[in-house]
Each structure stands twice: as structure tokens, then as C-alpha cells.
Amino acid sequence: MSNDEIVAGIMRDYILNLLKEKKRIDDRGFEDYRPIEVEVGVIEKAEGSALVKLGNTQVLVGIKATLGEPFPDTPNMGVMTTNVELVPLASPTFEPGPPDERAIELARVIDRGIRESRALNLEKMVIAPGKIVRVVFIDVHVLDHDGNLMDAIGIGAIAALLNARVPKVLYNEETGEVEILEEKEPLPVEKIPISVTFAKIGNYLVVDPTLEEEQIMDGRLTITTDETGHISAVQKSEGGAFKLEEVMYAVETAFKKAEEIRKIILNALEKANNSEE
């Protein structure tokens, strides 16, 4: 057995003993998030942006929007692409190069939560059907990894989309000419999907796992919900099995915690709007 395995075993026993006493390694309750800080409009050259701090986990999200062609199978819909970059400075386990499995999973789950909830109305991003649409890029940079990247990125992505302002566009059907105006407008964001992540450690479920908890967890479950009462994404990873009653508890808790996080995002947006006036 390697030294790393011995240390992991000791840490697992320590965390499990705390959980048996209804405690966590950082004194939070099982359903408590670490402090969440959201600041929008932090990247001047981006259409929208957000800096999110979830405890010591920190992510930066930028929104870029251009005009382009729609996909052939969806001529009446705009395009949205999500990319996650795990900056090597954020964690010793992150390496430079193309996105690894972790980055791909993070991008897919966040993208799915936004897409399936129809939070960003892609149909309203069409300039000329089948010809010209808005193309929106959600670019995520992980600056510091101390656990639960999924929720931090999810918060940052929707906050940045809500913060985004894009130039208005006029299309002349007769000439096919496009005029990009100086006047700006928000993206058609109509819902605020929020992901809530649970770590299963032994027989216990805890919200917003720290890096130490993630390193010894038996499984992870992320549930994305919107304010209309719908679930738009579910992701189980890191092995492990979840009982039906555990999933039902997680769903109920996800709706409750998402409402709290939604208020934090809206407060950050209101604060930014007030500072501009």
C-alpha cells in the first residue's frame, strides 16, 4: 500500500467518524454550502462575465457572442457552446493541454442544464432563419480547485449569461445585409437553472463537498433544477450506488438549495446594475 493510499484511508476514517457525529470537516451541516460570492462584469472585453468564489474554489466565466451559421439540423436556433479549462495553477492534478475527461464532463453537465431547461432561448437568437444566428461561447477558467467545481461553474455560467449584453442586429431580407448597431441588449435568458452537488461518503450524503471530501467519496450526484419546478440535468459519477430514497432526498434538497443560490445571483446582478447607474 502506497503512502497516498494510507493517507487517504486515514482521512476517510476521520471524515466518516465526523459524519457519524453529524459533523463535517469544516463544521458545516450536511446541507450547507460554503460561503458563495458572485461578482459580474469583471471582464471588460467580454459580452458578459462572472467571478464565483465557493469557499476556496474559484472560477471565472466569460461570455463571447458572434454571428454565424446555424447547424443544418437546427436552422431556427442559435448556437451555444460551453468550454471548461482547468488551469494548471488551480490544482497540482491539472495539466496543460487539451481538455481531459474532468473538463469535458463539467462542460457537458453545465451545457445540458442550460440547454434542457431552455434557460437560454436559442430560437430568439435567430437573425435570419437558416442563415445567420447568434453564436454564444461560455468559456470557463478554473482558477482555484478546492472541491465542487460543478456548482461553482454552474453559478458562474448562468450569472455571466444574465450579465451579458450584445449589440442589436438588423437584417435586411431583400438585400441580405446585416447591420450591427452600437445599442446593446441582453441575451434571451428566461430561466435560472442551478446545479446542486452531493457527495456520498459511506451512508451519508453531503452538499457541496470540499476537495478532501471528494477525494474519499464513494459517489457523486449532481441535480440541476430551474425555478419552474423542472429537473434539467442529472449526473452520477465517481462510481457508487444511490438508493431510491437517497435520490428522492437529493432532489428535494436540490430544489431548496437552488432557490437560495438563485437569490445570491440575482443580488449580484442587482448590485452591478445599481453601480452602473
UniProtKB/Swiss-Prot annotation:
The residues that cross the membrane are none
InterPro entries tied to this protein:
ExoRNase_PH_dom1, ExoRNase_PH_dom2, ExoRNase_PH_dom2_sf, Exosome_comp_Rrp42_subfam, PNPase/RNase_PH_dom_sf, Ribosomal_Su5_D2-typ_SF, Rrp42_archaea
* Keyword list, A-Z: Cytoplasm, Exosome
Which compartments is it annotated to reside in? Cytoplasm
Any single GO molecular-function term of the entry would be: mRNA 3'-UTR AU-rich region binding
What is any one of the record's Gene Ontology cellular component terms? cytoplasmic exosome (RNase complex)
Keyword ATP-binding carried by entry? no
The GO annotation for biological process reads:
rRNA catabolic process
Free-text function comment from the UniProt entry: Non-catalytic component of the exosome, which is a complex involved in RNA degradation. Contributes to the structuring of the Rrp41 active site.
The protein's assembly and partners: Component of the archaeal exosome complex. Forms a hexameric ring-like arrangement composed of 3 Rrp41-Rrp42 heterodimers. The hexameric ring associates with a trimer of Rrp4 and/or Csl4 subunits.
Family assignment from sequence similarity: Belongs to the RNase PH family. Rrp42 subfamily.
Which protein are we looking at? Exosome complex component Rrp42
Specify the species. Answer: Pyrococcus furiosus (strain ATCC 43587 / DSM 3638 / JCM 8422 / Vc1)
